[in-house]
């Protein structure tokens, strides 16, 4: 078993409505509170970062599972949505919805379609970010599997 370490440097020179920066490997960006939460809305924010972590982990996990299963695809895309609730000034990351769209080869069998649906579900429970937030953030899956040319 091996532990992998990841590091992030953060700089926040001002107050609540100012702008900071983060740097982690290839990621270098400005950060601030989003406009929807009465911030300046510059760069990214923790809400987008959590959504991005969950979405990238999920789609990479799904692609790896499809490859290991020998399931050929023409296309794999996804949209994800994060829902943050604010009640009495308390911010709670309530739900993440993943909407993967899998397009299989035009000659894929019904067994391939069933396997793609199964892997879409399995990727959610196998992704390390999904496992890390499980029990704190509701995860919802709305997968679409089609044959090429449909």
From Swiss-Prot:
Segments forming a coiled coil: none
Gene3D superfamilies: 3.30.300.20
Domain of life according to the entry: Bacteria
Cross-referenced InterPro entries: KH_dom-like_a/b, OsmC-like_firmicutes, OsmC/Ohr_fam, OsmC/Ohrsf, OsmC_Ohr_Peroxiredoxin
Family per record: Belongs to the OsmC/Ohr family.
Protein name according to UniProt: Uncharacterized protein YmaD
């Amino acid at each position: 078993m091996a532990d992998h370490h990841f590091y992030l440097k953060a700089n926040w020179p001002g107050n609540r409505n100012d702008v900071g920066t983060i740097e982690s490997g290839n990621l270098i960006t400005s950060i601030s509170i989003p406009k929807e939460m009465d911030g300046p809305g510059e760069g990214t924010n923790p809400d987008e970062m959590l959504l991005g972590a969950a979405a990238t982990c999920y789609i990479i996990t799904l692609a790896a599972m499809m490859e290991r299963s020998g399931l050929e695809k023409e296309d794999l895309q996804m949209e994800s949505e994060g829902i943050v609730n604010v009640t009495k000034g308390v911010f709670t990351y309530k739900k993440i919805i993943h909407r993967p769209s899998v397009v299989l080869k035009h000659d894929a069998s019904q067994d391939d379609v069933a396997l793609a649906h199964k892997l879409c579900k399995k990727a959610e429970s196998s992704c390390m970010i999904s496992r890390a937030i499980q029990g704190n953030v509701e995860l919802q899956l709305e997968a679409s599997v089609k044959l090429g040319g449909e």
